[in-house]
Amino acid sequence: MQCRLPRGLAGALLTLLCMGLLCLRYHLNLSPQRVQGTPELSQPNPGPPKLQLHDVFIAVKTTRAFHRLRLELLLDTWVSRTREQTFVFTDSPDKGLQERLGSHLVVTNCSAEHSHPALSCKMAAEFDTFLASGLRWFCHVDDDNYVNPRALLQLLRAFPLARDVYVGRPSLNRPIHASEPQPHNRTRLVQFWFATGGAGFCINRKLALKMAPWASGSRFMDTSALIRLPDDCTMGYIIECKLGGRLQPSPLFHSHLETLQLLRTAQLPEQVTLSYGVFEGKLNVIKLQGPFSPEEDPSRFRSLHCLLYPDTPWCPQLGAR
């Protein structure tokens, strides 16, 4: 009896020790570090940063004849607020512009003519420079456009990141038609919408990269010659006919081909682009009371700039308040 008690006690202790080890192993296997398939805790993905103005590439198309007449006005007004984002594409060197713009003046090898090949040549230069920049948005305007950077940024921020975006204002109330050459001397009639370059338009990088087979390098001019249409039409053709995309029409872009006086003063800060010019034999400008008279400011761009940026030093009345 005395010999059996220690042996039984030892067995009980051994059993308890084994059970304790099993429990410890069980709990260790259930810990987050040991359970297979359980991901490690991590910070949530913040996603792409919010679009800022420095993410936008603004291309201005011009020609030698308008360097003084139009470009200096833009440099004094809206370009002064978007200097780092704006690139001016022209056909001739200009020492004065070079001093003001530096590397943001792009002198192309394009003709100064107002022809389909010359216009497409400059658009191709704009597109290639944008692709090389790595920026998120490409926006094209002409040298008679005023760009409101605040309204532009608000518009572009509204589009989903995953979507191909082509936004602008069509100049026609119907699609344009073109003859697309086919093999065996045949042609195919195609129709598509396009945003008029005279009002400006924007394309995001996601879509621009898909356009490259028809738009990068000399291929943009080749595509334009193929359908015998100018640069802005060629953009619409590539996007809608080659890629199956669609123009997103926006009433916030404006050219000199519309009646600009219909815009109310209260609406002006919301517009992405505005313009001026002669339409149907009459001066076509926005209707705006401002610090400058129509004789001092025939385009009304200086008065508009003082409305949007009253802190501008040369705004005589609003700046003094």
UniProtKB/Swiss-Prot annotation:
Keywords: Developmental protein, Disulfide bond, Glycoprotein, Glycosyltransferase, Golgi apparatus, Manganese, Membrane, Metal-binding, Signal-anchor, Transferase, Transmembrane, Transmembrane helix. Residues 1-7 are cytoplasmic. It holds the Pfam family Fringe. Its cofactor is Mn(2+). Residues 28-321 are lumenal. Disulfide bonds join C110-C121, C139-C202, C306-C315. One of its GO terms (molecular function) is O-fucosylpeptide 3-beta-N-acetylglucosaminyltransferase activity. It is an enzyme of class 2 (transferase). The active site is at D232. Its EC number is 2.4.1.222. The chain crosses the membrane at residues 8-27. Has some activity with cobalt, magnesium and calcium, but not zinc. Glycans are attached at N109, N185. Mn(2+) binds at D144, H256. It catalyses: 3-O-(alpha-L-fucosyl)-L-threonyl-[EGF-like domain protein] + UDP-N-acetyl-alpha-D-glucosamine = 3-O-(N-acetyl-beta-D-glucosaminyl-(1->3)-alpha-L-fucosyl)-L-threonyl-[EGF-like domain protein] + UDP + H(+); 3-O-(alpha-L-fucosyl)-L-seryl-[EGF-like domain protein] + UDP-N-acetyl-alpha-D-glucosamine = 3-O-(N-acetyl-beta-D-glucosaminyl-(1->3)-alpha-L-fucosyl)-L-seryl-[EGF-like domain protein] + UDP + H(+). GO terms for biological process: blastocyst formation; marginal zone B cell differentiation; pattern specification process; positive regulation of Notch signaling pathway; regulation of Notch signaling pathway. Its main location: Golgi. Substrate binds at R70, D143. Glycosyltransferase that initiates the elongation of O-linked fucose residues attached to EGF-like repeats in the extracellular domain of Notch molecules. Modulates NOTCH1 activity by modifying O-fucose residues at specific EGF-like domains resulting in inhibition of NOTCH1 activation by JAG1 and enhancement of NOTCH1 activation by DLL1 via an increase in its binding to DLL1. Belongs to the glycosyltransferase 31 family. This is Beta-1,3-N-acetylglucosaminyltransferase manic fringe. It comes from Homo sapiens. The lineage of its organism: Eukaryota, Metazoa, Chordata, Craniata, Vertebrata.
